[in-house]
C-alpha cells in the first residue's frame, strides 16, 4: 500500500473488483492496482475487507494539547477511530487515556459523534480523566456526574461534550444515561465489568 499525495491509497490487489464494487471513490488502474480515496468511510470498508488501511486521523488531525503524541499513541488513536468497538491492551503508562481523548476529539471534529460518556473508577474521575481532558482537549466541554442522583441526572441531561461518571453511578442514573445522547462510550479499566453475573455488568 502506498499513500499518494496524502489524499489516496494505492493498492495492489489480485482482484481489484473486490474493492471497486464496494467503494464508490475508487478507480481501477493497470496492473491490478486500485486508487482509493483516503477517507474515514473508505478506510473502514478496506479494514472490513481485511486490508489494513491507516486511519485518516494520521493525515488530517491537529494533535491538540500541551504535549505532542508519541507514534504509538497516534497508532492507538487511529486504531480507535477505525473500530466501532475496540479494546486497548497497551501497557500501563503508555498514554492510553490521551489516545482515547484524541480519537474522540477527531470523531467529534468529523461530526461522526456528538457526545462522549467516560465510565471510570471513582478515584480517577478528576485526577486522571478531567485533568487529561483539560490537558489534551481543552477546547471541549467536560463535566463530572458525581454526587446526589438529581445532580448526576442534571449533568447527564446537560450539554457537556464529555461526561465522566463512575461505574456505580451508571446504575444510579441508568435511565438518564440511556437517554443522554451518548454515541461514544469509553470504559476505563473495563475489567470491572468482566463478570456477567454482576449488576454492574448487566
Question: Residue ranges of each PLM-predicted region?
Answer:
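The Walker A (P-loop) glycine that initiates the GxxxxGKT/S ATP-binding motif of P-loop NTPases
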Residues: 90
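Charged, low-complexity intrinsically disordered regions
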Residues: 1-53, 110
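SF2 helicase/translocase NTPase motor core
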Residues: 18-29, 51-78, 82-85, 94-202
Amino acid at each position: 500500500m502506498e499513500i499518494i499525495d496524502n489524499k489516496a491509497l494505492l493498492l495492489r490487489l489480485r482482484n481489484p473488483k473486490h474493492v471497486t464494487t464496494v467503494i464508490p471513490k475508487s478507480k481501477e488502474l493497470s496492473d491490478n492496482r486500485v486508487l482509493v480515496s483516503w477517507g474515514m468511510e473508505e478506510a473502514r470498508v478496506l479494514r472490513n475487507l481485511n486490508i489494513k488501511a491507516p486511519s485518516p486521523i494520521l493525515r488530517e488531525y491537529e494533535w491538540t494539547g500541551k504535549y505532542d503524541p508519541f507514534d504509538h499513541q497516534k497508532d492507538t488513536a487511529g486504531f480507535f477511530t477505525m473500530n466501532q468497538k475496540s479494546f486497548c491492551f497497551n501497557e500501563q503508562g503508555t498514554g492510553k487515556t490521551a489516545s482515547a481523548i484524541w480519537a474522540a476529539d477527531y470523531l467529534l471534529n468529523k461530526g461522526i459523534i456528538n457526545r462522549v460518556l467516560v465510565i471510570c473508577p471513582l478515584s480517577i474521575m478528576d485526577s486522571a480523566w478531567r485533568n487529561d481532558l483539560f490537558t489534551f482537549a481543552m477546547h471541549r466541554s467536560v463535566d463530572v456526574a458525581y454526587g446526589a442522583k438529581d445532580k448526576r441526572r442534571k449533568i447527564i441531561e446537560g450539554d457537556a461534550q464529555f461526561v465522566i461518571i463512575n461505574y456505580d453511578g451508571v446504575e444510579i442514573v441508568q435511565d438518564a444515561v440511556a437517554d443522554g445522547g451518548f454515541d461514544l462510550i469509553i470504559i476505563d479499566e473495563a475489567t470491572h465489568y468482566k463478570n456477567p453475573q454482576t449488576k454492574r455488568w448487566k
